[in-house]
Amino acid sequence: MAVKIRLRRMGAKKAPFYRIVVADSRSPRDGRFVEEIGYYNPVTEPTIIKFDEEKAVKWIKNGAQPTDIVKKLFDKAGLKDKLGK
């Protein structure tokens, strides 16, 4: 099973927020997921990014691939330093 860490869109029309989830790469964007590890709200000022770092590191070390957007969010939150990459 190819696993990705990606964003799942939630919220109202024109007021989105996103949950950071671990999901099978073949499932739809808002479909089934394995685990929820955090959320991202781009609408608020300042932008809110909260996630469980331990779960994120565990999934990445087990082979989960973060999408480009999630990778940028992790870098912004300082997770890159904890992974040693």
UniProtKB/Swiss-Prot annotation:
SUPFAM superfamilies: Ribosomal protein S16
Keywords carried by this UniProt record: Ribonucleoprotein, Ribosomal protein
Cellular component aspect of the GO annotation: cytoplasm; small ribosomal subunit
InterPro entries: Ribosomal_bS16 (IPR000307), Ribosomal_bS16_dom_sf (IPR023803)
Lineage: superkingdom: Bacteria
Family matches, as Pfam families: Ribosomal_S16 (PF00886)
A biological-process GO annotation: translation
Gene Ontology MF terms: structural constituent of ribosome
Family: Belongs to the bacterial ribosomal protein bS16 family.
Protein name stated in the entry: Small ribosomal subunit protein bS16
Native species: Clostridium kluyveri (strain ATCC 8527 / DSM 555 / NBRC 12016 / NCIMB 10680 / K1)
Name of the gene this protein is made from: rpsP
